[in-house]
Amino acid sequence: MTTITITRPDDWHIHLRDGAQLKDTVRDISRYMGRAIVMPNLVPPAIDTETALTYYDRIKAQVPAGSQFEPLMVLYLTDKTSPDEIRRAKASGKIVAAKLYPAGATTNSDSGVTDLKNIYPALEAMQEVGMLFLVHGEVTDSSIDIFDRERVFIENILSKIVADFPELKIVLEHITTKDAVDFVTQASDNVAATITAHHLLYNRNHMLAGGIRPHFYCLPILKRNTHQQALLAAAASGSKKFFLGTDSAPHAKDKKEAACGCAGSYTAHAAIELYAEAFESVNALDKLEAFASFNGPDFYNLPRNADTITLVKKPWDVPATYPLGDTNVVPIRAGEVIDWQVE
């Protein structure tokens, strides 16, 4: 039986939601992840230090006994985020980054940034104090095709931010295109990217060919196979610029299976197991540990986890649903088999 032991991984991009759903999302991600960067797009969003810290307390209250799981908090940037707020957040010791959501780009992004110039003072403060800048890299102009929104964002917006703030550490999150891979690869060492398991394992054919499969619908949307292969090559390349970020984003079953379904795929039930499948598919299991356990903390200037987990190649059946507060979520690979499991 094939087994691999790796340093305990972290998730550098996850949605834990809030309220009754929190106990279920925290249960799943804390099984073997040491830390997770927790997205702030709540209702209302975590736009200030106090809101982010009270959210931290709610998450910690749901961590199962015996788990050392630690949430790493993120400030939600708005047009009005001040340099002083950035300094307060950094001084808290628990908020490690601030997040750009272009207004309307994804779930609960209506409070997001309408003009990048509005956050330049905040970005200057972040560069000064060493706070990371996390980016949902899509334009929101309705005239831009949804499959092109990441590429256009990189060309028109991100390239300018990188030039204007050369000392700012930037994470282009959940990248989905060869364009993003190339940009991050060629940029300075201050630019990195997260890649999801579902963008490594799937492309838009899985979502659209032979019937619409709404649980694959996420933002940024799945792209064509050539982009999927570029992501796999980047993740398995050994480059320190790419690391694990699930973007696990639960929605109730009836919110996904609807005439106008929500964007987001749930992978926290089997995150590292799905990544193991992806890396095995390109004969790169030897590169999984760096991607999952080293590159993220190294980029964030945080210590690597000290303990390990062991993955065993032992297929198991994924339940059709998992509990999500007072409803259910349909996970990726629901009712099917995953080849790996954590011992």
Curated annotation (Swiss-Prot):
Q: What class of enzyme is it?
A: hydrolase
- EC number(s)? 3.5.2.3
GO MF terms, alphabetically ordered: dihydroorotase activity; zinc ion binding
Q: Where is the active site?
A: D247
Q: Which residues carry this modification: N6-carboxylysine?
A: K99
The positions annotated for binding Zn(2+) 1 are H13, H15, K99, D247
Entry GO CC: cytosol
Determine the domain of life of the protein's source. Answer: Bacteria
Please write the reaction equations for the catalytic activity of this protein. Answer: (S)-dihydroorotate + H2O = N-carbamoyl-L-aspartate + H(+)
Return the HAMAP family for the record: PyrC_classII (MF_00219)
Q: What does this protein do?
A: Catalyzes the reversible cyclization of carbamoyl aspartate to dihydroorotate.
Q: How does it assemble?
A: Homodimer.
Q: Report the family membership.
A: Belongs to the metallo-dependent hydrolases superfamily. DHOase family. Class II DHOase subfamily.
This protein is called what? Dihydroorotase
Question: Which source organism?
Answer: Shewanella baltica (strain OS185)
